[in-house]
Amino acid sequence: MHTDWSVFKGLASKPSQAEWVKANVFLLGDIHNHCSLSYGHGSLDHAIAFACQQLDFFSVTGHFAWPDMNDDAMNIPEEVKSYHREGFAKLRLGWGEYLAKIKASKTSGIIPFVSYEYHSFTYGDYTIVCKDLDTLLPPEPERVDTRLADLVAKNDAQASGVICMPHHIGYKEGYRGISWGHFNQKASPLVEIISMHGCSENIDAPIKYLHTMGPRSRHNTMQGGLALGYRFGIMGSTDHHNASPGSYGSGRAGVWAESKESNSIWDAFLQRKTMALSGDPIMMAWFIDDRPLGEVVELHDHAVLDGYILATERLSSVEVVSDGETIRSYTDFPPNGSNKKRFNFACGWGSRGMACDWNISIRVEGAQVTDVVPRLRGEYIVDPLAECDESSELLASVRHCENSVHLVCRTAGNVTPTTDGTQGFSFGLEIEEEYTVIVDVEAVYAGQSHTKTFRYASSELKDGPTAEYIDGFVSPAFSLSDEIDSGECLLEIHENIPVKKDGYIYLRAFQKNGDVAYSTPIWIELR
């Protein structure tokens, strides 16, 4: 995404903040997702290729072990135990090939990490993320499996190069939700709070828990852990089970790092310079007394908060949260009248289960395409036992070429009326007074090929979004948004906040398209 921090006038009078923004880059990643490496769907090759389309860093995660799976009190069906055992064994057999392919992915310009996963009723589920790309799996236990227990209790992420990241923490304790009583922030500098399971920022957070594993429970949330005094960075991951790291809408991580290099990203993990995103890369650079997110600040009686929020879509609200309470809320994001605009494009719809292969080009006359933000989704399959045709893994892709954008993808309708199966992207324009957006569509649907061209004058694009169908009613369609003024996508905050006790402050932002972003807190200690 094109980032022009000069739009924030307050940075000019905040030299240390301006220097921090200049010295750091915002990166997008997903370090917890699955494929057929253990149990799941889709090949590792496809997972790596999919990650390269829209992420800066990634991992593909193997299901590794479930130490207390045989707890009779939990009444786990035998077929569930069986596919877990088979998946764990499959991971061990394929680990060498996995490491080789993960290491080879570096040549594509993406930064890889190694990861595997423990399930646990007692501790909650953990993704074990490893910096060393030659990491071997732990040996099998001789008797009682204490490997996860030992990691959670004894690991020091700063020294070991291993992060124990709890995920889908919102489930009930004892039912694979987090056990805050066993949590160790030295072992776990990161906690995942958004994924395809839902959002666990707080008990009422948008994106409900709707998986078969159950609802959110009591204090098993980000705010619940913070209230206990823990300090951790927050992450989003897809937890996608169909070879689609970074699948749009399922959860992603935003990281502020000094560079797009493995060491810098790992340092950012350890320093808690992280954000949890549902989809779009909503960037929040913010400070208390000139100290950035993830840090601990000593104060007397007030906090000077400065924030700079840059979204890819119209913002609907931004909130400042202190110790679980919303203390500031911003809902006014007026157009600034600049020549920088944004648009959203999406294609899909049509009859459920009927594939449409798209080849789309968007060209612009009288304006310059400044940036493109992909919104690519993997096919949404959760059940490891579900049938899935993996004979042809079409890779969706978005390319920005000079003054045009090209999208190649397949859609097959929406699984339910509330499940988004579209593919698309956001793009920025630097415009002249008048301009034209041209959409060239090639689509193959129901055995027929359709080729169409649509032209939209800038005057039309100020009058609301457009919708076009390729072959009449309930055929696949595309949508091009109306013109979005860049002022509607940004916010600058400068606040003096009274502080009466030790605690934490963080930001959360909401876009009008439903995407959300949460920042890691800044912790406050009174002098």
What are these regions (language model features)?
Residues 1-527:
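Extended, charged catalytic domains and RNA/DNA-binding interfaces, predominantly
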